[in-house]
Amino acid sequence: MNTTAYASPPRDMHPRSTMPSLHDTTYRSGPPHQGAPYSMPQTMASQHSTISAYEQYNNSLPVSRPPPPEHLPSSEAVSSFSIGLPGQEPSPRSITVDGRKYTLEVQQQPKRARMCGFGDKDRRPITPPPCVKLSITEIATGKEVDVNNIEHGMFVLNVDLWSADGERPVNLVRHSQTSPSISATVPVSYTQIQGGAAAYSSLLPGQSQREPTSPTYGSAPPFQGAGFSPFPGPPQVSAYSQQQPGQQSGYGGNPNYPPPNGYQVAPQQSNYYYPQPSQSIPSHNNQDPYPSRPFTPQDLGIGRIPISQTNPPQGMFTRNLIGSLSASAFRLTDPDDRIGIWFVLQDLSVRTEGDFRLRFSFVNVGVPSAPQNNANSSCSVNTGKAPVLASCFSEVFKVYSAKKFPGVVESTPLSKCFATQGIKIPIRKDGKDGPGKGGKDGSRGDDDDDY
């Protein structure tokens, strides 16, 4: 068999899109060597020749990314090449349904808020309240649909909390606690470290503190002979409080401790571990197994897990954005005397401080029984799925702590205009009641006094 050593890789080893032209002088190498086909110097020389050719080719490539193709529209080019770039504003989205395009626009942006923490008693809304306007455009004519010809009774706007860059939602926050919480989902119990000794929790109820010479399942009262805190919670009933001949108490229990009812009972289950009913109990000292507590002998090899090696509970998840997270549509008049379909979200609060955005999503939950050509067309509730017809993001607003909060924003003309039309928007007073209205020093009191 004749074998040829190539000074450059064959043509079929590289895709055509990434392989330079073979007619390029920088890529072509000299003629094949005439020595032994598997000679080590020739192999090393061919590799060096190939690397040098590719280094020259890569150095000739431009460093910057090529511009987007010219045949793409400008909007598609930006969306396909600018997604996830830092500092880019998230763009609104809208879809066309039945020849109509729905568009959302935040006319009044949120600016700042005071964090409300994890209690619901002292909750401060975002100021100024976000006001979103809905516009519906006919695709055929390009004109906006008259508000009086739109049935808005089933229009709903949902809001959720997003990060300042608009890349991820931050609707949930973990409520951290200093003391661990007991949960049925945690298979082990968590105890406090006392006297510098390592605290352990047993996966199998009744397992001894030290490895016994024989399998034992007895336990004494929690405060006898234990080098660490036992399971927290209510007192446990000692099932094997009276020792059997030839057995050792795993917790150093008192052998004279009488059984609670005069006879031996099956071991009690722990509040933190529930074994599967398909397991069986091993017999020890030729005793019959207890059918009420079965498990296999292989389970005896399960050791105790130190708390430092487990994931302690970090608290429960709760919503970061609280309040009225949805709003119905209203036909309102703005300060310029123009009628439109508006969504006002005046009851939104954030638990934690930081920079955030609000994302608004518009959904029509109604199913019209007739074409929406007049305001009297009846609608029924959609019991299936409803698509998000439009969505948009607000500008970045800041949530302050209680000490750093500069105060609520002055009421805007738009808020005052909507308040006169029956929308429940908190309006700041003009301070006509005098300085005594506020604190003891004559200054304005807390923000609650201004509403």
Swiss-Prot record:
Ranges of Low complexity composition bias in the record: 267-283
Pfam families: Velvet
GO biological process: sporulation resulting in formation of a cellular spore
Coiled-coil regions, chain positions: none
Alphabetic keyword roster: Cytoplasm, Nucleus, Sporulation, Transcription, Transcription regulation
Location(s) in or outside the cell: Nucleus; Cytoplasm
Bias (Polar residues) ranges: 18-28, 40-62, 205-217
InterPro entries: Velvet, Velvet_dom, Velvet_dom_sf
GO cellular component, one term: nucleus
Chain spans, region Disordered: 1-95, 205-312, 426-451
Record flagged with keyword Protease: no
Family that this chain belongs to: Belongs to the velvet family. VelB subfamily.
Name assigned to this protein: Velvet complex subunit 2
Organism: Botryotinia fuckeliana (strain B05.10)
